[in-house]
Design a protein with these regions (language model features):
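Canonical Rossmann dinucleotide-binding motif of NAD(H)/NADP(H)-dependent dehydrogenases/reductases
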Residues: 3-33
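Conserved glycine-rich Rossmann-like NAD(P)H-binding loop of the short-chain dehydrogenase/reductase
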Residues: 30-44
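Substrate-binding pocket helix/loop in short-chain dehydrogenase/reductase
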Residues: 97-98, 105-107, 208, 212
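Active-site helix of classical SDR
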Residues: 121, 157, 165
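Alpha-helical segment proximal to the catalytic Tyr-Lys
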Residues: 126, 170-174, 240
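Residue(s) in the substrate-gating loop at a strand-loop-helix junction
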Residues: 141
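Short C-terminal tail/terminal secondary-structure segment
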Residues: 146, 232, 243-260
Length: 260
């Protein structure tokens, strides 16, 4: 079903969840501009979309660069005629506690994971208002609620996304712009693979993924496509009364106690 037919979308992040969301929105009928800093991932997404004849155009960008993102927004509007959907999926995941994390790493994490959301709200909301409203979806994390050790910058950034989402939702509800966040648990992405390699360098990644999955009540880790399905719903008019919320795709992880 083409529930997003006639919608124009901008998605940041071209690997993992961002890639899956760009593909899913296009499969739902949206015209999509996806942007990311990883040139290899950008090329792979462009090829995958072309193979399926999906309307996904891929742009290189640094989501922390105000003028660069202004250009991406202008490109989206000029090519497709407007902007209805923004998905903020670009993220970095540095490791370390407060002593181990230097200020440059902290600031970069906050700018990529949180500052980029502000930048696209600043640039994109005026375009959405011209269309009579829109939907913004921010990728947060269960680590914004309960975190593991050694990820101080990442966990702080994901908690900040929850608060920023609520603030944007309240400010722009009168503009008919809905703003929601999604908090995934462990999802099979390149980022999770790097995390597995960092915390368990002597184990095979597949074994670590299996162990991560066992911590979730459903007994497995999730897929990017499962997150993308929720994003497509929140982007659609079917979610017309949903704003200011955070939605878990965590296999029940936060429903239980860590003590077994």
């Amino acid at each position: 079903m083409k529930e997003l037919l006639g919608k124009q979308a901008l998605v940041t992040g071209t690997t993992g969840i961002g890639r899956a969301i760009a593909m899913r929105l296009a499969a739902g009928g949206a015209q999509v501009v996806a942007c990311g800093i990883d040139t290899i991932a950008n090329a792979e997404l462009a090829r995958a979309a072309a193979d399926l004849h999906l309307a996904v155009e891929v742009e290189a960008c640094d989501v922390t660069d105000l003028e660069g993102m202004r250009s991406v927004v202008r490109t989206t509007v000029s090519r497709f005629g407007g902007l209805d959907i923004i998905v903020n999926a670009a993220a970095i995941h540095p490791f370390g506690n407060a002593v181990e994390t230097d200020l440059e790493t902290w600031n970069r994490c906050m700018m990529v994971n949180v500052g980029s959301i502000f930048i696209l709200a600043h640039l994109g909301i005026p375009e959405m208002k011209k269309r009579g409203g829109g939907s913004i979806i921010n990728l947060a994390s269960v680590q914004g609620y309960a975190c593991q050790r050694g990820v101080v910058a990442y966990a702080a950034s994901k908690g900040a996304i929850h608060s920023l989402t609520r603030a944007l939702a309240l400010d722009h509800a009168p503009d008919n712009i809905r703003v929601n966040s999604i908090s995934p648990g462990s999802i099979a992405t390149p980022m999770l693979a790097r995390s597995a390699a960092h915390f368990s360098p002597d184990e095979d990644v597949a074994q670590v993924f299996s162990r991560f999955g066992a911590a979730h009540p459903l007994g497995r880790i999730g897929t990017p496509e499962e997150v993308a399905e929720l994003a497509a719903f929140l982007a659609s008019d079917k979610a017309g009364f949903c704003t200011g919320g955070d939605y878990l795709v965590d296999g029940g992880l936060l429903a239980g106690l860590a003590v077994q």
